[in-house]
C-alpha cells in the first residue's frame, strides 16, 4: 500500500493565509472611508447601508467599471499605488453626472497568485478614491485563481451605488438652444484609450520611464490617476441650475456628449478655448493619430462637460475654479436637426 501525499489548498495555488494577511493590512485604510450610514464592518456576508435621511424620494443609482488596459501599463511599470483611484473615479464620475452622491463602493480583485504588497497598494488606492469622493469602501472580493492569470498579473473591477433626490435627477432633458458648455480639465488620459497608448509606445520604441515630457517622465503623465470630480460637481448642482453633465470616457467627445443631448440639439465645441496637455500632443505625434481619432479615443484634456443656462455661467465658473477645478467655457448648444450631434470647430 503506497502512502498518498496529503494535499492542501495551498498546494493547489491558493494561499488563504496570504488572503487573511491582506485583510489585516487594509483594515485601517478602509475604516477611514466609513460613512455614518454604513452598519457593521468588514467581514460580513453582505454590507449594510442606510439611506441618508435628508432625501425625501431617494433614487439609487448604480455603476460598475474597470480601468481597461491602463492596468497592463501599471503592471509593466510596477506602479500599483494609483490604479485603485482610477477604478473608483471611473465609477463615481459616472454616478455624479446624474446628480447622484456616491454612498458605497465594492471592489473585485482577481489574480493568479496573490502578492499581498501589490494587492494592498491597489486597495489602498481604492480607499483613497473613496475618500476623495466621499463614499464608503464597504467590501470586496479577492480571488486567487491559479491557472487563470499569468504569473502575478491581476484584474480589478469596481461597483458603486449612489443616491439622488428623484426631483433632482440630471438626465439632459432640460438642455436647450443657447445653453453654455463648461469644461472641467482632466489629469491626463484618465482610464481610456490605453490600448492605443500601448500601441504607440510599442511602435515608437519609446521607454516611458526615461522619456521626459514637460519636465517629468512620460510614465508619470500616462499613469496620472483619473480626476475625481464628485465633490466639486455636487456643490455646483446644489447652487447652480445644471441641465446635463457628460463624463468623457471611452468614445471621447463624439460618443459621450450625445448621450446627454435631447433630440434636435447640437453641441458646438470651440477648439480654440483650450490647449491640449502635452501628453496628448505627444500621443498624436508619436502615433501619427488623426484629429478625429484623437477626439474619439481620448479626452484631450477635458474630463467632463457641463451644460447650463447662460445666466449661470459666471457663478458656475467661479465655484468650480474655487474648488480647485480647471474650468472654462468650451462651447454652446444650438438647435439643430443635423445627424452630427457634436461639432468641433
Swiss-Prot record:
GO molecular function, one term: phosphoribosylformylglycinamidine cyclo-ligase activity
This protein's UniProt keywords: ATP-binding, Cytoplasm, Ligase, Nucleotide-binding, Purine biosynthesis
Enzyme Commission code: 6.3.3.1
Gene Ontology BP annotations: 'de novo' IMP biosynthetic process; adenine biosynthetic process
Keyword Aminoacyl-tRNA synthetase: no
Entry annotated with the keyword Cytoplasm: yes
Stored InterPro entries: PurM-like_C_dom (IPR010918), PurM-like_C_sf (IPR036676), PurM-like_N (IPR016188), PurM-like_N_sf (IPR036921), PurM_cligase (IPR004733)
Pathway named in the protein's UniProt entry: Purine metabolism; IMP biosynthesis via de novo pathway; 5-amino-1-(5-phospho-D-ribosyl)imidazole from N(2)-formyl-N(1)-(5-phospho-D-ribosyl)glycinamide: step 2/2
Cysteine pairs bridged by disulfides in the record: none
Main location: cytoplasm
CDD domains xrefs: PurM (cd02196)
A cellular component annotation (GO) from this entry: cytosol
Subcellular location: Cytoplasm
Chemical reaction(s) catalysed: 2-formamido-N(1)-(5-O-phospho-beta-D-ribosyl)acetamidine + ATP = 5-amino-1-(5-phospho-beta-D-ribosyl)imidazole + ADP + phosphate + H(+)
One Pfam family this sequence matches: AIRS_C
SUPFAM superfamilies: PurM C-terminal domain-like, PurM N-terminal domain-like
Family: Belongs to the AIR synthase family.
Quaternary structure annotation from Swiss-Prot or TrEMBL: Homodimer.
Matching PANTHER family: TRIFUNCTIONAL PURINE BIOSYNTHETIC PROTEIN ADENOSINE-3, TRIFUNCTIONAL PURINE BIOSYNTHETIC PROTEIN ADENOSINE-3-RELATED
Protein name: Phosphoribosylformylglycinamidine cyclo-ligase
Amino acid at each position: 500500500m503506497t502512502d498518498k501525499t496529503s494535499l492542501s489548498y495551498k498546494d493547489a495555488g491558493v494561499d488563504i493565509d496570504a488572503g487573511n494577511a491582506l485583510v489585516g493590512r487594509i483594515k485601517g485604510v478602509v475604516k477611514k472611508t466609513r460613512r455614518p450610514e454604513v452598519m457593521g464592518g468588514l467581514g460580513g456576508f453582505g454590507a449594510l447601508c442606510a439611506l441618508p435621511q435628508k432625501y425625501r424620494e431617494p433614487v439609487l443609482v448604480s455603476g460598475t467599471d474597470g480601468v481597461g488596459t491602463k492596468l497592463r501599463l501599471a503592471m509593466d511599470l510596477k506602479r500599483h499605488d494609483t490604479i485603485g483611484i482610477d477604478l473608483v473615479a471611473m465609477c463615481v464620475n459616472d454616478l455624479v453626472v446624474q446628480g447622484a452622491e456616491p454612498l458605497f463602493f465594492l471592489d473585485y480583485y482577481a489574480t493568479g497568485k496573490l502578492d499581498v504588497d501589490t494587492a494592498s497598494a491597489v486597495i489602498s488606492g481604492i480607499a483613497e478614491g473613496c475618500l476623495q469622493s466621499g463614499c464608503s469602501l464597504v467590501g470586496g472580493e479577492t480571488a486567487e485563481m491559479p491557472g487563470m492569470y499569468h504569473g502575478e498579473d491581476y484584474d480589478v473591477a469596481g461597483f458603486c451605488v449612489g443616491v439622488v433626490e428623484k426631483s433632482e435627477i440630471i438626465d439632459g432633458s432640460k438642455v436647450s438652444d443657447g445653453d453654455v458648455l463648461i469644461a472641467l480639465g482632466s489629469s491626463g488620459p484618465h482610464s481610456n484609450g490605453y490600448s492605443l497608448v500601448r500601441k504607440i509606445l510599442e511602435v515608437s520604441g519609446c521607454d516611458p520611464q526615461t522619456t521626459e515630457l514637460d519636465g517629468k517622465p512620460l510614465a508619470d503623465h500616462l499613469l496620472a490617476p483619473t480626476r475625481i470630480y464628485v465633490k466639486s460637481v455636487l456643490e455646483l448642482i446644489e447652487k447652480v441650475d445644471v441641465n446635463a453633465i457628460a463624463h468623457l470616457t471611452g468614445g471621447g467627445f463624439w460618443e459621450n456628449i450625445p448621450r446627454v443631448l435631447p433630440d434636435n440639439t447640437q453641441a458646438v465645441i470651440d477648439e480654440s478655448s483650450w490647449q491640449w496637455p502635452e501628453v496628448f500632443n505627444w500621443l498624436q505625434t508619436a502615433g501619427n493619430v488623426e484629429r478625429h481619432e484623437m477626439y474619439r479615443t481620448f479626452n484631450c484634456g477635458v474630463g467632463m462637460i457641463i451644460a447650463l443656462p447662460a445666466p449661470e455661467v459666471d457663478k458656475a465658473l467661479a465655484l468650480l475654479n474655487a474648488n480647485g477645478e480647471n474650468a472654462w467655457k468650451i462651447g454652446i448648444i444650438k438647435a439643430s436637426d443635423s445627424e452630427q450631434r457634436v461639432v468641433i470647430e
